[in-house]
From Swiss-Prot:
The lineage of its organism: Eukaryota, Metazoa, Chordata, Craniata, Vertebrata. One of its GO terms (cellular component) is excitatory synapse. Residues 249-298 are annotated as: Repeats, Gly-rich. This is Synaptophysin. Coiled coil: none annotated.
Length: 307
């Protein structure tokens, strides 16, 4: 009991509410319906043979058949209408292969769904370890989807043949006494095959479930990551018109307005306003505008002379 309690306490039951676990529950339930409706079937048909000699007639002949539908082994006794004798009439066909294949796939799908669901709940860490669990789950799901397609299609064809072989009208056509003049053969009851029809429906529903579950298992494998495109990034912001002068702004390094050593550290116009060119710019303590001027090479000596 302690082990059971620990498993229950450590179980991640929320996975049942997620698509991966919820679909697995549906697969488990639908697999039960598929093999139960087919594997437990028992059918019966009735017919009558009325001979010219009324005393030899059989007015209620019951013929039973069941899964796995080896109809060639099913027979019934019918009056031969000749001197009180009877004749064994065998049904035609062996449809056990398609029926047994369908039931086998359903049973294994039931067992796998139950095991996978238990793994999702109680062994989630082991399931995701090294990504082997999702990959094996995906391959198994793909195989079962294919097997459901094949088995359901084969059983649908087999069921059609079973209906033909158990139709009282077709059986009567093969009975020799019914072809004799004076004898009358009638069908009294057709077999009820609604349960078998339901099994075919559940087979194709299982096919839909297993094919649909491929996507949810595929996402768990991580194989979808290369195909998942990242959302486009935000467009690059264009600089505002005011930023054309540079990021530094006024008076802050290159690109700004500021007084960067007058107009440059070397050459060009250097307003020294009262100091020699080698002493740097500025107003300086030596005189006013008229002293030293711009320089010594043929330029005006002061602002007053230029005026």
């Amino acid at each position: 009991m302690d082990v059971v309690n620990q498993l229950v306490a450590g179980g991640q039951f929320r996975v049942v509410k997620e698509p991966l676990g919820f679909v697995k529950v549906l697969q488990w339930v639908f697999a039960i319906f598929a093999f139960a409706t087919c594997g437990s079937y028992t059918g019966e048909l009735r017919l009558s043979v009325e001979c010219a000699n009324k005393t030899e007639s059989a007015l209620n002949i019951e013929v039973e058949f069941e899964y796995p539908f080896r109809l060639h082994q099913v027979y019934f006794d019918a009056p031969s209408c000749v001197k009180g004798g009877t004749t064994k009439i065998f049904l035609v066909g062996d449809y056990s292969s398609s029926a047994e294949f369908f039931v086998t796939v359903a049973v294994f799908a039931f067992l796998y769904s139950m095991g996978a669901l238990a793994t999702y709940i109680f062994l989630q860490n082991k399931y995701r370890e090294n990504n082997k669990g999702p990959m094996m789950d995906f391959l198994a799901t793909a195989v079962f989807a294919f097997m459901w397609l094949v088995s359901s299609s084969a059983w649908a064809k087999g069921l059609s043949d079973v209906k033909m072989a158990t139709d009282p009208e077709n059986i009567i056509k093969e009975m020799p006494m019914c072809r004799q003049t004076g004898n009358t053969c009638k069908e009294l009851r057709d077999p009820v095959t609604s349960g078998l029809n339901t099994s075919v429906v559940f087979g194709f529903l299982n096919l839909v479930l297993w094919v649909g579950n491929l996507w949810f298992v595929f996402k768990e494998t991580g194989w979808a990551a290369p195909f998942m495109r990242a959302p486009p990034g935000a467009p690059e912001k264009q600089p505002a018109p005011g930023d054309a002068y540079g990021d530094a702004g006024y008076g802050q390094g290159p690109g700004g307005y500021g007084p960067q050593d007058s107009y440059g550290p070397q050459g060009g116009y250097q307003p020294d306003y009262g100091q020699p060119a080698s002493g740097g710019g500025g107003y300086g303590p030596q005189g006013d505008y008229g002293q030293q001027g711009y320089g010594q090479q043929g330029a005006p000596t002061s602002f007053s002379n230029q005026m």
